[in-house]
Amino acid sequence: YGIETDIHCTKDSKIVCFHDFNLKAKFKINKFLKNIKYQDLLKISKDKKKPIPLLNDLIKLSKNKRFLMLEIKPLFTKENLKALLKEVKNLKNYSLTSFNEKNIINLHKIKKKLNLGLLIPSTFTFNRVIEKSKKKHVKFLVLEKKFLREKKLHKIKKKIYFYAIRDKKLFNQFNNKNLIFENL
């Protein structure tokens, strides 16, 4: 199995692995990651004994032995995208994904040969999924699990992953698919 993580930039442009845009749910502090410096974030996470690693820490830990799927949560500036590419330059097996297609477009403009995936929410129609799959900057799709039962998946000529599988029964039923799962 590989590792999927969400990434954000702090106020001082450090790339961190964290799911939420805000610290409220995990730390009961109403601050957005983009508005806080990494040293302040580090202090909060250490005080609460809930570490927030830098992307670079995850990369070192993975030692190029695990596939890393890195989801860019907010819209990154072009400077932050370039910094991200610098951090992943020595990785052999990774992909960059986002719900925000502008991140994928901008990454593709910077470097054409990246493994870029577009995340597709459950609100999309299947026709819209097909349309997005034809974009040259999209190398693969990450579809919400509702699309697992879609009969016309074969029409998509790119690799497909499915998120977020939290149910063992569903995992076992579709384990021949590319599933992104959590807490199983």
Which residues are covered by each model-predicted region?
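A residue-level structural signature of the nucleotidyltransferase/glycosyltransferase Rossmann-like core
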Residues: 2, 15, 33, 95-96, ...
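Metal-dependent phosphodiesterase/phospholipase catalytic core, i.e.
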Residues: 19-123, 136-139, 143-146
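C-terminal active-site rim and adjoining tail of enzyme catalytic domains
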Residues: 8, 43-52, 117-184
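Short amphipathic alpha-helical segments
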Residues: 16, 108-109, 153-154
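Sequence-level detector for tyrosine residue identity
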Residues: 1, 38, 94, 161-163
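Short acidic, gly/pro-rich beta-turn/loop elements at beta-sheet edges
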Residues: 15, 80, 106, 128, ...
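Glycine-rich, proline-tolerant flexible connector loops at the mouths of alpha/beta enzymes
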Residues: 4-23
